[in-house]
Every structure is written in C-alpha cells, then in structure tokens.
Design a protein with these regions (language model features):
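Eukaryote-biased feature marking scaffold/signaling PDZ-domain proteins and nuclear chromatin regulators
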Residues: 5, 259, 283-285
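A short, conserved structural fragment
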Residues: 5-17
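Core SAM-dependent methyltransferase catalytic element
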Residues: 272-304
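Short, hydrophobic-biased segments on the C-terminal half of alpha helices
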Residues: 1-2, 265
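Alpha-helix C-terminal capping/helix-coil junction sites
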Residues: 5-6, 56, 269
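Conserved adenosyl
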Residues: 30-234, 238-243, 275-276, 280-281
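C-terminal alpha-helical "lid/dimerization" subdomain adjacent to the S-adenosyl-L-methionine
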Residues: 231-271, 275-279
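Short, cationic-aromatic polyanion-contact patches
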Residues: 14-37
C-alpha cells in the first residue's frame, strides 16, 4: 500500500492509514483501466529498456519494421527465440495476455462519450449516412474487438439490426454474436476485404498500430471494397502534444505511429481515396472520413 501511495494510486494519511483518492475512484468506476495499467507498465517498459541498445547495435536503423521493434530485440537479447520474429500482439497471445488486453479495449482508461455522440459533436452527420439504402450492410467495424462500438451505434439507431452490423476481428470473441454479425478476418494476410460496398468501414485505433507500409496495405484493401457511396471512418487520436507518449509507445511496440492531417491525405491519395471530413480534438479520438477519389466535391470539411 505504501508503494501504491508513492505511485499516487491512493493517498497516504499516516504509516498505517490510506485513503481513496480520485485515481482510486476512477479505477473502480472504469475497471478496464486496471487492465490498461497492467499493459502500459509491462510491454512499453520492456520495449523501452532495449530501445537504445537496438538503435546502437543497428547503427540507428529507423523506422523500425513491425516485427523488428525493441520488443522483439529484447527477446533476442535474452535468447527467447520463440518470440524473436513474432508480432507484439502474437507475443501477447502466446503469453496468454490477450484476454486482459481485450478487457482493456472495452473501456480503455475512460471514454469521451459514445461513438455516435462523439462524431455528432464534431458536426458529422452519421445518421444521414446510415439512412442510405444503397447497401444492406450499414457498418463494417474492422478490428473492433468485441463489438462495443457497433453496440453503441445500434443503441443510437435502433432500426439497425444484426444483419446490418458486421464485426471483423482476428479470432473474434463471440460474446455479442446475438447482436452482431461476426466474421473472422486477419487483415494482415493476403485475403481481401470480403464485404463489398458497405455504407461505412470503421476503424478505431487500428492504423496507429501499423507501420506506414502496413497501414497503406490495409487502406488499399478497404478502398478496393468500397463503392462510390462508401465511407471509411478512422477514429484515432490527434498528433499533438497530448498524445506524444502514445506516439512513442506505438513506435516501440508495433513500428506504428499517430498521424497528422497531412499524413492522412498522403496515404489516402496513394489508396485512391480522398479526405472529406476531419476533426482533431485536443483530447479523445478524432475523426477522419475518406471516400473514393472523385466521388465528393473535392473539398474537405474540417471541424472547428
């Protein structure tokens, strides 16, 4: 308990008495934060311990490759050969850590409102998009964990049923199978996006785990599946001082990164897309909408 007080998790009254503080209360109110604390005090610290060693030994070779980050280099240094060529998520899976990580992803360290509420606050009209009858599939949530975001959408737009909402995940949890259409998809293999012409393809905190090359590969797969009326909605943190530590963590663990408006537009152009809406709040997930090149009026809406 004394150590916990030193970390600020509880308040120290005297050498035998401790008191709940706002951090303690937050951990109770947002239980997923406990899993987040576990992961953000293990994987990133492990990787950071070998960051300078890898840079020095490789003559500062950078950017990292996704399976050749300081995470894998650390296991190479201690001769844990089974992890040396594995992706960080694969290592976590092999170590039995993914159930805890999935629990963290359900609520993270706290939420900035539901997805429908958040995009509405940016001035984005999701309701109008979902009213289209161009395709029966309203939203495909790629890498959407257990489907929490789709359930938020379903609650906000009750006309949407199971057959309208597709969750795509690698080795998906079937927890919400009664509410959502669940598909297994490893977007990192060579298989294409199987759902063609959905109204929305949504990705929340997916691209920041990917190197530029891998992010572009995924973006191109989705672009190939999109129809002229389709939209790709990207929910990511803004590249600002608030998320500098997150940016560094993504580099160390996955060779990923947080991206700016300029970088999103560059990637969109390479995938045959264009940015048609963007919002970058100081804190919380922003929103980037992309559509097929030439299907909009050629201007990008930027939320204030």
């Amino acid at each position: 308990m004394f150590a916990m007080a030193g970390l600020g998790l509880v308040d120290l009254v005297d050498d035998t008495t401790y008191r709940v503080n706002p951090v303690t209360a937050h951990m109770v109110a947002v239980p997923s934060s406990l899993d987040g604390m576990l992961h953000f005090t293990t994987e990133p610290l492990w990787s950071a311990a070998f960051l300078m060693r890898q840079l020095r030994d490789t003559k500062f070779e950078y950017p990292f490759q996704e399976n050749k980050t300081p995470t894998q280099y650390g296991y190479k240094m201690i001769d844990e050969q089974r992890f040396v060529d594995e992706h960080t998520y694969s290592i976590m899976h092999m170590q039995g850590r993914m159930p805890s990580f999935s629990s963290f992803m359900e609520g993270k360290f706290g939420r900035f409102g539901t997805m429908p509420e958040r995009v509405k606050s940016f001035g984005y009209d999701l309701g109008s998009v979902l009213e289209s009858e161009a395709n029966n599939i309203a939203i495909v949530d790629i890498g959407g964990g257990r489907g929490e975001m789709l359930l938020e959408v379903k609650q906000a737009y009750p006309h949407l049923k199971k057959e309208h909402l597709v969750l795509q995940e690698y080795r998906p949890d079937q927890k919400n199978a009664n509410e959502l259409t669940i598909q297994n998809w490893d977007f990192k293999d060579e298989s294409p996006e199987s759902v063609k012409g959905a109204l929305v393809y949504s990705l929340t905190h997916i691209y920041h785990n990917l190197s530029d090359l891998e992010a572009l590969r995924l973006m191109k797969k989705i672009s190939d599946a999109m129809a002229p009326y389709s939209r790709m909605l990207i929910h990511e943190f803004a590249k600002n001082a608030t998320y500098g530590k997150m940016h560094a963590t993504m580099i160390q663990l996955y060779a990923g990164r947080i991206r700016s408006s300029r970088e999103w537009k560059q990637m969109a152009a390479l995938a045959g897309l264009e940015v048609t809406f963007e919002a970058y709040p100081v804190a919380g997930e922003g929103l980037v909408e992309m559509r097929k090149l030439g299907t909009s009026d050629g201007t990008s809406d930027v939320a204030a």
